[in-house]
Amino acid sequence: MAEDEGYPAEVIEIIGRTGTTGDVTQVKVRILEGRDKGRVIRRNVRGPVRIGDILILRETEREAREIKSRR
């Protein structure tokens, strides 16, 4: 797959909601192609998402920060 198109990644876990209004979902994805194939990373996703969905990532190096619980 060309780098211009992105890298497919499968959603394997939904971690939780984030963002000021809860409109962003943090998920763990397993990268399916490219040099990071098989790597599991955490990403933020806007819009509806379910376990098993395939996301196309523009790049696979950045990882979202862990959601911290409020006290």
Curated annotation (Swiss-Prot):
The record ties this protein, via CDD domains, to: S1_S28E
Q: What GO CC annotations are associated with the protein?
A: cytosolic small ribosomal subunit
| The keyword Ribosomal protein is annotated on this UniProt entry | yes
Family designation: Belongs to the eukaryotic ribosomal protein eS28 family.
Q: Give any single GO term for biological process.
A: maturation of SSU-rRNA
User: What quaternary structure, including any partners, is listed in this protein's UniProt entry?
Assistant: Part of the 30S ribosomal subunit.
Q: What is this protein's record name?
A: Small ribosomal subunit protein eS28
What HAMAP family does this protein's entry cite?
Ribosomal_eS28
The record's keywords, sorted A to Z, are: Ribonucleoprotein, Ribosomal protein
> What PROSITE patterns does its record include?
RIBOSOMAL_S28E
* Family matches, as InterPro entries: NA-bd_OB-fold, Ribosomal_eS28, Ribosomal_eS28_CS
Name one molecular function that GO assigns to this entry.
structural constituent of ribosome
